[in-house]
Amino acid sequence: MLLGKDVDEVLERHLDIGGNLFKGIRHAGSWDSSNMINNSHHNPPKDMYLMKEFGEGLKILSGKGLVFEAWQYHHQLLQVAHLASNNPDLIIVLDHFSGPLGIGSYATIKEQVYKNWKKDLKELSQYKNVFAKLGGLAMPINGLGFEANPNPPT
């Protein structure tokens, strides 16, 4: 999406190759200033979802009827609300319920994290073009400690 308007050519190529099997893209924007918390695999810039080029790319994606999967941390939820507000025809899937962090500096303020997460999820829920994917809430970044158990939590 950071290609802005130039993403059209890339999406067209995907549509040509994938046909009706190509439904959309996931562009992970999870970013935190702490060196104890990993950013997304491609190390996105801070506030990537608010960048002009990203918004231009989403307009192209939306115009093609494709889906956008958003993966970011809890403190970035309102950036997704910004995307939803500016792209009412774009279907947005909120991956991993926006990863509430529970490690690093967040480990000692979990109650505040969950309070803010709940408030921001409620704000986001007003947008009928946003859907949430339930999963990924037992990752080590959530700080629940499931990774220390001998067996998975489910």
Identify the meaning behind each predicted range.
Residues 1, 23-30, 66-68:
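Divalent metal-dependent hydrolysis catalytic cores, especially in the metallo-beta-lactamase
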Residues 1-13:
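A metal-dependent hydrolase metal-coordination microenvironment
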Residues 5-8, 32-36, 78-79:
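Short, well-ordered, mixed-charge alpha-helical segments that flank or form enzyme active sites
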Residues 16:
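Gly/Ser-rich oxyanion-binding loop with an adjacent helix/lid
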Residues 27-48:
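Glycine-rich phosphate-binding "P-loop"
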Residues 43-154:
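Catalytic pocket-lining loop regions of alpha/beta-barrel enzymes
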